[in-house]
Amino acid sequence: MKHGIYYAYWEQEWEADYKYYIEKVAKLGFDILEIAASPLPFYSDIQINELKACAHGNGITLTVGHGPSAEQNLSSPDPDIRKNAKAFYTDLLKRLYKLDVHLIGGALYSYWPIDYTKTIDKKGDWERSVESVREVAKVAEACGVDFCLEVLNRFENYLINTAQEGVDFVKQVDHNNVKVMLDTFHMNIEEDSIGGAIRTAGSYLGHLHTGECNRKVPGRGRIPWVEIGEALADIGYNGSVVMEPFVRMGGTVGSNIKVWRDISNGADEKMLDREAQAALDFSRYVLECHKHS
């Protein structure tokens, strides 16, 4: 497995100096830095090349996370919005190719956060989304990018809430580079068994986010990590595992993620670094010690 962390653990906005965090996570011992997609459409080719060179120079693989806006909603009943969303992803995927990024994950099939004041049409949105994702998947394949669809809890989305729904959706899209993405935070809310959910995803699992039920780093709460490690071993998972802790209030990140108290207990950057490094050591051990010989 390759282990990573989402840059926003340290940040309060959905953009940052990614080169700074590449160098940081390399020193902490990570393999992967996950960055946000939102600023990438505004990068020049020079900026893209500089970021790619920084990642390569530090031995860091970049993955990308994205919470699509309502204007990027591939499931929208408005054909103009779906057309705009397809154009957005086409441009973004070409940029990921230039950046040498091979994985994007998130609520790519819908938008985030959901406006629940509007009427929900799960069946219609599902059908439109499957058709749209199938079309975008062709571009992703040409760009060498896995398109990973994140299973989210009911408070953040309504289309795909369980691993089984994720597998059903991916099977309907029927494209090799469209995969299921699971997250321990969301599974803790929706699944009867986290290990069972991972086994349900099986070979369709393309990306895994980790974190505690209160968004702390792995190992600081009650998520059943041994069970998760055993399930990953059972399905032979050897892909990316990216921790996605959110522990700081403030900014767009704190508002979107609903962090209303300082979960970090006043930690400064160095303390956050130490927590991340300890969580990395914990994750490497508990998630990989069950591998079948």
Swiss-Prot record:
pH-related activity info reads: Optimum pH is 8.
**What Pfam families is this protein classified in?**
AP_endonuc_2 (PF01261)
Active-site residues per Swiss-Prot or TrEMBL entry: 150 (proton donor/acceptor), 244 (proton donor/acceptor)
Reaction(s) catalysed by this chain's protein: D-allulose = keto-D-fructose
Keywords linked to the UniProt accession: Cobalt, Isomerase, Manganese, Metal-binding
Q: Which cofactor does it need?
A: Mn(2+); Co(2+)
Its activity depends on temperature as follows:
Optimum temperature is 55 degrees Celsius.
Q: How is the cofactor bound, in the record's words?
A: Binds 1 Mn(2+) or Co(2+) ion per subunit. Can also use Mg(2+), Fe(2+) and Ni(2+) ions to a lesser extent.
Q: Which domain of life is it from?
A: Bacteria
Q: What is its EC number?
A: 5.1.3.30
Q: Which SUPFAM superfamilies match?
A: Xylose isomerase-like (SSF51658)
Q: Does the keyword Lipid biosynthesis apply?
A: no
Positions binding substrate in this chain are 6, 107, 156, 183-186, 215
A GO term for molecular function: cobalt ion binding
Binding residues for Mn(2+): 150, 183, 209, 244
User: Repeat as a keyword?
Assistant: no
Q: Which family does it belong to?
A: Belongs to the hyi family.
Function, in words: Involved in the biosynthesis of D-psicose. Catalyzes the reversible epimerization of D-fructose at the C3 position to yield D-psicose. The enzyme is highly specific for D-psicose and shows very low activity with D-tagatose.
Q: Which PANTHER family match?
A: HYDROXYPYRUVATE ISOMERASE, INOSOSE DEHYDRATASE
Q: How does it assemble?
A: Homotetramer.
Protein name stated in the entry = D-psicose 3-epimerase
Instruction: Give the organism, scientific name.
Output: Ruminiclostridium cellulolyticum (strain ATCC 35319 / DSM 5812 / JCM 6584 / H10)
